[in-house]
Amino acid sequence: MAIELKMPALSPTMEEGTLTRWLVKEGDSIKAGEILAEIETDKAIMEFEAVDEGVITKILIPEGSENVKVGTAIAYLGTDANDVTLDGASAETKAEESAPVASPAKTEAAAVEEAATPSLGKVINSAPEIPEGTEFFQQTLREALRDAMAEEMRRDDRVFVMGEEVAEYQGAYKVTQGLLQEFGARRVVDTPISEYGFSGIGVGAAMEGLRPVIEFMTMNFSMQAIDHIINSAAKTHYMSGGQVRCPIVFRGPNGAAPRVGAQHTQNFGPWYAAVPGLVVLAPYDAIDAKGLLKAAIRSDDPVVFLECELLYGKTFDVPKMDDFVLPIGKARIIREGKDVTIVSYSIGVSFALTAAEALAKEGIDAEVIDLRTLRPLDKETILQSLAKTNRIVTVEDGWPVCSISSEIAAIAMEEGFDNLDAPVLRVTNADTPTPYAENLEKKGLVNPEAIIEAVRKVCYRK
């Protein structure tokens, strides 16, 4: 039986691309991981890999084809050169031509959306900072971030946004959509591709009393600006004896994303959280994103604001409040439970909630904590939950060594040891650079199944 090879999504915002050229022809035998074609978008040319071995039995889209929609079948992969009969799933998809077809990347994003919306009644959709009776409306995380910046720019004319493609292109992930039209080019500033340059300008502007919001196309590129972030922004208040503040926000997507390789999938939360003088925020949902970004812009300290591109398009309930600002340094219990505490942040919260729902069917009642702030860490909420459940499992979309998970384990041991009935277990990504090949990438990233396994161990169910 043949399977369809579909036009991949190279980013969560990609809708179509150009199939630049085929690197294989009909009848070629291929192995998993072999490069089949080159796909071009308005930003880059990427390679399309085979996810399985077989024979290219038919090429459906010729090379050079433009505006190929994501999810379009571009070739058949079969067991031999004459195999063009689709398997059941592919045949059904083909028969239902009007139904949208998900690419591998969009399938993962859809899984994240499902994970982030568990059906258990114990999930707390609100936050303790929201008054009872508040009306809610639905908004994507991307829109919540945009509204937070727009509201603060209306409130304070010292606030401005600067970064690559934030103005005319409206952000690499469309987070700054509409800001240029409302506030103009003096306050929404496109920059050259020089993170070191525009971050330094931002730090200087902050020291002179402005409130810059610096967008990195990805936090991986913040490595080019790390001297300004750590040696200038983070240390100025201390080294000036409290005379000079640096109210600046460095924000952008952080952590793993589908098929972007080892250099674009790193989690910098633990890196920046290790630095005295920095505030580090990592929102999970639109409530976190809006309330914390507004707080970050108002903060007199430098803030590193870590977003997740897989959650940008996810829709959440957001409170209808004139000025919704969350406190920095305060975690929230997003699901109540009594048997085990699962602590996470950013996209890890979605996996934790999915795991908690599955564990409930086994009779394990898990409490889930959304950290929201990585520095300063809310030790009080963690330790209070530990005192109730006597077990902690941490979940982190990042490496295990010198991680936020490691810090939580240390806190539990140093300040909550008498309440521990089991060792603290960490569920993280593999301790290796993230592979580009889809099958290897999947094995190396944190997932709900690994969380379930860890919880069973600390509850002595296995």
UniProtKB/Swiss-Prot annotation:
CDD domains: lipoyl_domain, TPP_PYR_E1-PDHc-beta_like
SUPFAM superfamilies: Single hybrid motif, Thiamin diphosphate-binding fold (THDP-binding), TK C-terminal domain-like
Keyword Oxidoreductase: yes
Protein keywords: Lipoyl, Oxidoreductase, Pyruvate, Thiamine pyrophosphate
Sequence ranges assigned to domain Lipoyl-binding in this UniProt record: 2-78
Record keyword Oxidoreductase present: yes
Domain of life of the native organism: Bacteria
Cofactors required: (R)-lipoate; thiamine diphosphate
Its biological purpose: The pyruvate dehydrogenase complex catalyzes the overall conversion of pyruvate to acetyl-CoA and CO(2). It contains multiple copies of three enzymatic components: pyruvate dehydrogenase (E1), dihydrolipoamide acetyltransferase (E2) and lipoamide dehydrogenase (E3).
Full protein name: Pyruvate dehydrogenase E1 component subunit beta
